[in-house]
Amino acid sequence: MMLAVTGCKVQLSAPAPGSSPGPAPSATSAPATSGPSTAAVAGPLVIEPAAGFSPVYRLIDHARHSIDVTMYEFSDGTAEHGLALAEARGVRVRVVLDKREESVNSGAYQYLTSHGVKVVWSWSKYQYTHQKTVVIDGAEAVIMTANLTRTYYPTSRDFLVVDSNPADVAAISAVFDADFAHAAVTPGDGTDLVWSPTDSQQKLLAVINGATSSLRIYSEEMGDTEVEDALIDAAKRGVDVQVCGENEDGEYNSAYSRLADAGVHISYYSSSTGFYIHGKVIEADYGTAHAKVFIGSENFSSTSLDRNRELGLIVSDPAVLSAIASTFAADFQRGQHVPSA
């Protein structure tokens, strides 16, 4: 499935010296960005931790009319200052922060509101507002697996995509307007969006169930039975399934053992102070004409898929696919592997 998406208007170059954290010692040598966008890409792919967050800061600094931010956790003084400066120069800045993470978000809430930025806590209709997006001028949306939380920048594997497809950005903006007002909305999917709690499980299962040769998956969490069953079914029908995830304190020992015993290849990391798999990615059938990749905020848990506000997208751009594949291969090799029965 080829998804026509237009490119980004602001060039995302390498971060300036000292402007953001450098790569963690275990970061791969994969390119920080995927290169020029094509007709099937949602803009440059930014790979963390190597790239840093200067690409996001620059987009904020270039905003002329509006900035809408939806963030699960927000604790980044540079981004906060950039939003305050934008408000001061006449840009309309609005922010939705997750209420359940108030202990993390209260500093940003207080700073931004004191500088005239309109900030609201998330609607209690959703268990968590786990979405991570920044919409610039109603024309571009940064869709992230990462939170704007500086503490985690040096060690977390995360991915950011800049989407300037008009249908996508319009749909994201419409949902933001509703969420900001605590109003009900049925999200539009635009060209290639994946929303929780409306259709994420259905769309992620479709990617997994449609795979014919390979699946490469980053997942911080594992706990949705339907997704696990789909991965097992894929392995049983001959798809090469590899999962790279987290397993701090053995939280997912049972799920990983079940998957490994069914033929799924598992590699994980388990230190909260070292390299951390925070990205949420499903790459299907890399190297084939029908390859595609999901990138977003959704974890493989029933809470994430069925009760949270989440956002991701599915694209088929060759440069994005290639960058994900090379990064995944290195991360998978370095992790701790789960033996099969």
Describe the role of every protein-language-model region.
Residues A40-E73:
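Mature N-terminal segment immediately following signal peptide/propeptide cleavage
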Residues S196-T198:
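Hinge/beta->alpha junction and helix N-cap segments in small-molecule ligand-binding domains
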Residues M2, T6-G22, T28-F53, T78-A141, ...:
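PLD/PLD-like phosphodiesterase catalytic module centered on the HKD motif
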Residues G52-F53, Y57-H65, S200-S214:
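Secondary-structure "cap/kink" motif recognition
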